[in-house]
A protein has these predicted regions:
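Conserved, well-structured core segments that form or line functional sites
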Residues: 2-156
Length: 156
């Protein structure tokens, strides 16, 4: 993942491993560029979550709050992996894990601006919807890059 703040720079796994808290994780990922095949997206909205109730960043809204399960285990693993889940039984949403291995944390990717691959995304999205809405909202963002549960655990 590269980050644009005047110039492109890489958000490394080491950076995500050493994040001190959810706010820092969100700020690290906000503005970065996610590339999936021929599509490049600049992340413009995120939601950062802490982890378990007994962890360093307890967060009741986090999928990891009640502990590790088969569904959320990616959030407890090494930093820089996708945690993909189905929302409302129909939309796939993406989080990027952060923090040290064994400590849960995730940043939900809520919205992005498409920088490259407009033709690919337009074939996946409704022709009646304006292009600035194709990756607005976590479900739309996931659909724009065709994320599925098979992508869960993928390195970013």
């Amino acid at each position: 993942m590269s980050q644009r703040r005047g110039h492109n720079r890489r958000v490394s796994i080491e950076t995500l491993e050493n994040v001190e808290n959810p706010l820092e994780a969100g700020l690290t990922i906000l503005g970065s560029t996610l590339t999936v095949d021929d599509i490049s997206l600049r992340i413009v909205e995120v939601e950062a979550y802490g982890g378990e109730k007994d962890g360093p960043w307890p967060d009741p809204a986090a999928h990891s709050y009640r502990g590790r399960t088969p569904r959320n285990s990616v959030m407890f693993g090494r930093a820089g992996r996708l945690y993909v889940y189905r929302s409302y039984g129909m939309h796939f949403c993406m989080n990027i894990s952060y923090g040290p291995d064994g400590v849960a944390g995730g940043v939900l990717l809520r919205a992005a601006e498409i920088e490259a691959g407009h033709d690919v995304v337009s074939a996946r999205r409704s022709p009646d919807r304006p292009s600035h809405q194709w990756a607005r909202g976590p479900g739309n963002l996931g659909a724009s890059v065709a994320i599925t549960l098979a992508d869960n655990g993928t390195d970013v």
